[in-house]
């Protein structure tokens, strides 16, 4: 007979353990979403009312709130174990604290398999991690065997810190090898679970023979059938049906991000393991779903240490960090310089023969800098609390690949209505821009020079319109915020990075004392006075 399987799935939760606001920031009012206590309730209800349930995570549990800064993944282990996840695929952010920060706490302490078929250890560390990262796992669900194969984005070495001894191989080739192996072992129901983005998920569904369902992540893709329940706009139906090269309809799913939804897919297989029906929708975890009291109590208990942590000294400033509105929205501000310098530092990777680094430029919208830090108050001591006042939105600094012409367009947008105190003026690092405000909007950029990367002595050189550049920027801008529609990244050119306050905090800690200056990174030419 046929076999009905219910797949519950999360991806890109990014340390949202507590419930959040509608846009996945701090929950302040009544209208709150997600959080692990609320997810626990929904999972319990579905396990009680459905026979064959799998709970899967497609990676990027790590990084995104102060929970991760403090607990470093112990919080992920604790709550994923208590929610009884069946399997997790590794995302790029699981490597943010290096291989050691992945091994312990995560790999050594979870009670479920961690999967990735396309990561190949080489050299000295191969023995340390053998047995901790599996290519696939066969799970008994009811009377049937289900094979789950994991995969992780090939971009991980550029996006995170996996170190020199892990090789990230082509997803389709590696998945095919393991799908063939599972088929040989007599497993005819196979799920690919991984973290390479929606376009790659679809390519896997199209190319890999034997894979019946693809559960993905990385691009925070929201799929929905019918009219969406909140403010996310659907990129396609749920499940998205991809026609495979061998003529099958393969359901592909993703559940947005930040634990705001719980992915819910019902799949019916015939006795040969062929998918005959697939339906479902992500479930919005809004306040109509009660938070599980036991889980909620554990969150409260663990939160106490967070509060102590956020009031500890990180470092000091010996100058006024001007993050005022009338500075950062009108001209260069030294706090903007500090933030962007920290972001470039955070993205230093292994240099190669061509480049001292893969990226040299950062931009941040002045409106995203929400508070100054006064060096005369409290001896200039900087804590995480102060940084959270400067950068309160819990955003990340992401990597975008764009053409020079697009970057120039962004700098025109930066001053298209200069003087009104709007938030789009760009603070920078690795960029020198000259504006002439006497010109018409759209024609105000006099010159735009950028720091070379393919050079042994970094120098500012003119931006080339046709060349592709990498730029670091707030996730808010990569989503087209503040009118920067030209920067709206699609999954092929945009990768999410680390939490803003943790980047700036780590930099200040490393420096001990900071004294950012006004450096003429942004200049208004005489014609505009």
From Swiss-Prot:
Residues that hold Zn(2+) 2 according to the record: 12, 60, 92, 195, 218
One Pfam family it belongs to: 5_nucleotid_C
Disulphide connectivity of cysteines: 27-32, 328-333, 340-362, 452-455
InterPro entries given in the database record: 5'-Nucleotdase_C (IPR008334), 5'-Nucleotdase_C_sf (IPR036907), 5'-Nucleotdase_CS (IPR006146), 5_nucleotidase/apyrase (IPR006179), Calcineurin-like_PHP_ApaH (IPR004843), Metallo-depent_PP-like (IPR029052)
Annotated keywords: Disulfide bond, Glycoprotein, GPI-anchor, Hydrolase, Lipoprotein, Membrane, Metal-binding, Nucleotide-binding, Signal, Zinc
Main location (coarse class): membrane
Cofactor: Zn(2+)
Keyword Transit peptide assigned: no
EC number: 3.1.3.5
UniProt keyword annotation of Translocase present: no
Record's subcellular location: Membrane
Residues anchoring lipid (GPI-anchor amidated serine): 525
GO cellular component: plasma membrane; side of membrane
Membrane topology annotation: Lipid-anchor; GPI-anchor
Glycosylation positions in this chain: 308, 322
Tissue-wise expression: Expressed by the venom gland.
Family: Belongs to the 5'-nucleotidase family.
Protein name: Snake venom 5'-nucleotidase
Originating organism: Naja atra (Chinese cobra)
């Amino acid at each position: 007979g046929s076999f009905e399987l219910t797949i519950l799935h999360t991806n890109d939760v990014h340390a949202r353990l507590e419930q959040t606001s509608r846009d996945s920031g701090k929950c302040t009012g009544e209208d709150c979403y997600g959080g692990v206590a609320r997810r626990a309730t929904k999972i319990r209800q579905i396990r009680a009312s459905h026979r064959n349930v799998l709970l899967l995570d497609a990676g990027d549990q790590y990084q995104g709130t102060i929970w991760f800064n403090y607990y470093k993944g112990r919080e992920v282990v604790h709550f994923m174990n208590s929610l009884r996840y069946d399997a997790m695929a590794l995302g790029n952010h699981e490597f943010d604290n290096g291989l050691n920060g992945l091994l312990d706490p995560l790999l050594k302490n979870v009670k479920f398999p961690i999967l990735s078929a396309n990561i190949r250890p080489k050299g000295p560390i191969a023995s340390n991690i053998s047995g901790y990262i599996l290519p696939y796992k066969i799970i008994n669900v009811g009377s049937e065997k289900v094979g789950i194969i994991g995969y992780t984005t090939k971009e991980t070495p550029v996006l995170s810190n996996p170190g020199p001894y892990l090789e990230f191989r082509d997803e389709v080739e590696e998945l095919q090898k393991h799908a063939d192996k599972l088929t040989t072992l007599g497993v005819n129901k196979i799920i690919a679970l991984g973290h390479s983005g929606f376009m790659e998920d679809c390519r896997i569904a199209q190319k890999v023979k034997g894979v019946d369902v693809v559960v993905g992540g990385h691009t925070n893709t929201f799929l929905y059938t019918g009219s969406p329940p909140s403010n996310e706009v659907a990129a396609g139906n749920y499940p998205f049906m991809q026609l495979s090269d061998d003529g099958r309809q393969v359901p592909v799913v993703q559940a947005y991000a930040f634990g705001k939804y719980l992915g819910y897919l019902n799949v019916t297989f015939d006795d040969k393991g062929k998918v005959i029906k697939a339906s479902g929708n992500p479930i919005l975890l809004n306040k109509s779903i009660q938070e599980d009291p036991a889980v909620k109590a554990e969150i409260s208990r663990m939160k106490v240490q967070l509060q102590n942590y956020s009031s500890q000294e990180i470092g000091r400033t010996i100058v006024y960090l001007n993050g005022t509105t009338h500075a950062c929205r009108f001209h260069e501000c030294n706090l903007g310089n500090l933030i962007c310098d920290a972001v470039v530092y955070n993205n230093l990777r292994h240099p190669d023969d061509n480049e001292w680094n893969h990226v040299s430029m950062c931009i941040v919208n002045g409106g995203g800098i929400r508070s100054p830090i006064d060096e005369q108050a409290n001896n200039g001591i900087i804590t995480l609390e102060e940084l959270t006042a400067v950068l309160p939105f819990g955003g990340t600094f992401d990597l975008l690949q764009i053409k020079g012409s697009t970057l120039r367009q962004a700098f025109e947008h930066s001053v298209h209505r200069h003087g009104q105190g709007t938030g789009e003026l760009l603070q920078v690092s690795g960029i020198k821009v000259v504006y002439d405000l006497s010109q018409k909007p759209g024609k105000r950029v006099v010159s735009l020079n950028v720091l070379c990367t393919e050079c042994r002595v970094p120098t500012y050189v003119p931006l080339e319109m046709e060349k592709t550049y990498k730029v670091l920027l707030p996730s808010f801008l990569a989503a087209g915020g503040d009118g920067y529609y030209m920067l709206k990244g699609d999954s092929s050119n945009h990768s999410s990075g680390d939490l803003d306050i943790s980047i700036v905090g780590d930099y200040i800690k490393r420096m001990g004392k900071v004294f950012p200056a006004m450096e003429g990174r942004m200049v208004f030419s005489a014609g505009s006075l």
